[in-house]
């Protein structure tokens, strides 16, 4: 492959207190936490919406709201609240989640699974970010890190508006891939490939019958049952 030397150019600059790279759930919570403490915060996300794997992967929130099943003898109680629980609470108000449901099988890394409506999740998190005054930079790619003497001073972004430099006092890498850290020169290891997995949603079927069929063929690895429509919380 040939190399191309890009000519030097001047780009617009903005300054904030905190830059959060990645708008998945971790990035949303980090940006909200910073903004709610009074920090001028910018959230950079390359998709046109927030939510990351929860919204595009159909994974629900394997949320670590508690891990009592993975550690026998640990008290059964909710240990994570704060902003994550605020998101769930607001989703419940608009019918966007069935709430925390206890894992019945496959609880080696969580004890509850929180299924969400992906479109309402996008709406709720975007609304919360706007309410907190976070500068949303959607459809924006993290192109590079600006590093001086081993310290990240800023980032270069690319969007439909062109390239931009953002300088800040603090940076959070919530890309899921360590993109900001890698661009800044941090060591990293290429992960092993993960098998492709698909999620699906179905309606007007017998959940019990489907589960019985899967269980009879030893095809159930994880099992969690949320509230049905109309059931009390």
Range-by-range predicted roles:
Residues 1-18:
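Extreme N-terminal leader/targeting segments of oxidoreductases
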Residues 7, 33, 39-40, 45-144, ...:
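Conserved N-terminal/central alpha/beta ligand/cofactor-binding core
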Residues 14-16, 161-170:
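Core beta-strand elements of the Rossmann-like FAD/NAD(P) dinucleotide-binding domain
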Residues 18-42:
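N-terminal Rossmann-like FAD-binding beta1-loop-alpha1 element of flavoenzymes
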Residues 21, 166-176:
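Short hydrophobic core segments
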Residues 23, 159, 175-176, 184:
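Glycine-rich, N-terminal phosphate-binding loop of Rossmann-like dinucleotide-binding domains
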Residues 66, 178-233:
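Rossmann-like dinucleotide-binding core of oxidoreductases
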Residues 146-165:
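Conserved beta-strand-loop-beta-strand element in the redox core of flavoprotein oxidoreductases
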């Amino acid at each position: 492959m040939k190399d191309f030397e890009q000519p030097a150019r001047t780009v617009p600059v903005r300054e904030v207190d905190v830059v959060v790279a990645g708008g998945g759930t971790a990035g949303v919570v980090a940006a909200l936490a910073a903004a709610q403490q009074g920090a001028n915060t910018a959230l950079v996300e390359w998709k046109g919406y927030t939510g990351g794997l929860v919204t595009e992967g159909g994974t629900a929130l394997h949320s670590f709201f508690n891990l009592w099943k993975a550690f026998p003898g640990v008290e059964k109680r909710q240990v994570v609240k704060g902003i994550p629980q605020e998101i769930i609470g607001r989703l419940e108000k608009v019918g966007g989640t069935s709430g925390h449901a206890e894992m019945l099988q496959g609880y080696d890394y969580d004890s509850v699974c929180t299924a969400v409506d992906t479109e309402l999740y996008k709406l709720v998190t975007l609304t919360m970010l706007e309410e907190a005054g976070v500068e949303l930079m959607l459809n924006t790619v993290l192109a590079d890190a600006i590093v001086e003497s081993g310290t990240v001073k800023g980032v270069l972004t690319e969007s439909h508006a062109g390239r931009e430099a953002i300088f800040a006092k603090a940076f959070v890498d919530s890309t899921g891939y360590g993109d900001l850290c890698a661009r800044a020169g941090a060591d990293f290891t290429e992960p092993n490939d993960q098998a492709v997995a698909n999620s699906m949603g179905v309606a007007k079927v017998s959940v019990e019958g489907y589960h019985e069929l899967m269980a009879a063929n030893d095809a159930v690895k994880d099992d969690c049952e949320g509230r049905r429509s109309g059931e009390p919380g």
